[in-house]
């Protein structure tokens, strides 16, 4: 029995989420249907990160146990040939039997994209959240530094959580860029794991900082759970799961494969 890992990107607009659900299309459902079409096997795909309806991914990871004899290159080409247009396989590699896409991960990286132009770009409407008021990105970047380190992020979460709500945030920053002359604000956050709606609540609160509605102390109060009313949930369609990282020895095989199938540049951009 082989254990195959896949690196996946998708446009989350028309999905009800990444996990199997009974009320519409899911990323997991589409992947499993494509796998069965390619290999004849009915297998369960294990996803590294759970994304909500409308959330996109540039570097989702899944693994599947299989008896297929298809080469890795054939798996990539074959899945991309039968998957719907809003999902793509970027890479595939062999992993040890004990590898688990979710539980073996040591770092997850998310990006939130804000269209901050004078008028919203129609080209970005499904892939960036529009904020009309010019944001003070420097103030947002100063505020977000407070989340770096080990903290209880329960004040930024929604709904019941499994186990501890303490997470380790490795990096967090707010920067500016432009696409087609349209100013964008990028919010990047990396942590060992995330709680439900943690990034979207963080972003929504940071927008309050950028608009001058709350200051750094107000942001700190939200993080401490002392000012839950100032917390705002940002729209799903601006959020991207950019990458999932694994222990260094688990990526060596991936590096070899990616070079072999000619998608090194794609993987390096994750």
Swiss-Prot record:
Xref: InterPro entries: PsdUridine_synth_cat_dom_sf (IPR020103), PsdUridine_synth_TruA (IPR001406), PsdUridine_synth_TruA_a/b_dom (IPR020097), PsdUridine_synth_TruA_C (IPR020095), TruA/RsuA/RluB/E/F_N (IPR020094)
A GO BP entry: tRNA pseudouridine synthesis
SUPFAM superfamilies: Pseudouridine synthase
Highest taxon listed in the record's lineage: Bacteria
Binding, substrate: 110
Active site: 52
Pfam families on file: PseudoU_synth_1
EC number: 5.4.99.12
Gene3D superfamilies, A to Z: Pseudouridine synthase I, catalytic domain, C-terminal subdomain (3.30.70.660), Pseudouridine synthase I, catalytic domain, N-terminal subdomain (3.30.70.580)
Residue ranges that the Swiss-Prot or TrEMBL entry lists as coiled coil: none
Recorded GO MF terms: RNA binding; tRNA pseudouridine(38-40) synthase activity
Keywords, comma-separated and alphabetical: Isomerase, tRNA processing
Catalysed conversion reaction: uridine(38/39/40) in tRNA = pseudouridine(38/39/40) in tRNA
Cited function: Formation of pseudouridine at positions 38, 39 and 40 in the anticodon stem and loop of transfer RNAs.
Protein family: Belongs to the tRNA pseudouridine synthase TruA family.
Assembly: Homodimer.
Full protein name: tRNA pseudouridine synthase A
Organism: Roseiflexus castenholzii (strain DSM 13941 / HLO8)
């Amino acid at each position: 029995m082989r254990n195959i890992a896949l690196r996946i990107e998708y446009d989350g607009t028309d999905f009800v989420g990444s996990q199997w659900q009974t009320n519409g299309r899911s990323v997991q459902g589409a992947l499993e249907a494509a796998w069965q079409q390619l290999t004849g096997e009915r297998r369960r795909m294990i996803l590294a990160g759970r994304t909500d309806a409308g959330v996109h991914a540039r570097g989702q990871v899944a693994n599947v146990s299989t008896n297929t004899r298809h080469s890795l290159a054939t798996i990539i080409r074959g899945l991309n040939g039968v998957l719907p247009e809003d999902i793509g396989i970027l890479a595939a590699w062999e992993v040890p039997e004990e590898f688990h896409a979710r539980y073996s991960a040591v770092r997850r990286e998310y990006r939130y994209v804000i269209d901050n132009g004078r008028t919203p770009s129609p080209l970005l409407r499904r892939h960036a959240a529009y904020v009309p008021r010019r944001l003070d990105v420097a103030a947002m970047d100063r505020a977000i530094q407070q989340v770096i380190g080990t903290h209880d992020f329960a004040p930024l979460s929604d709904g019941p959580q499994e186990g501890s709500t303490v997470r380790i945030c490795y990096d967090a920053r707010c920067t500016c860029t432009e696409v087609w002359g349209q100013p964008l604000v990028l919010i990047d956050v990396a942590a060992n794991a995330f709680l439900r709606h943690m990034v979207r609540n963080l972003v929504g609160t940071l927008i309050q900082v950028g608009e001058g509605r709350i200051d750094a102390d107000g942001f700190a109060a939200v993080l401490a759970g002392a000012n839950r009313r100032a917390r705002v949930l940002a729209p799903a369609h601006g959020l991207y799961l950019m990458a999932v990282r694994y222990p260094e020895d688990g990526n060596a095989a991936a590096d070899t494969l990616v070079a072999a199938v000619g998608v090194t540049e794609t993987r390096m951009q994750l």
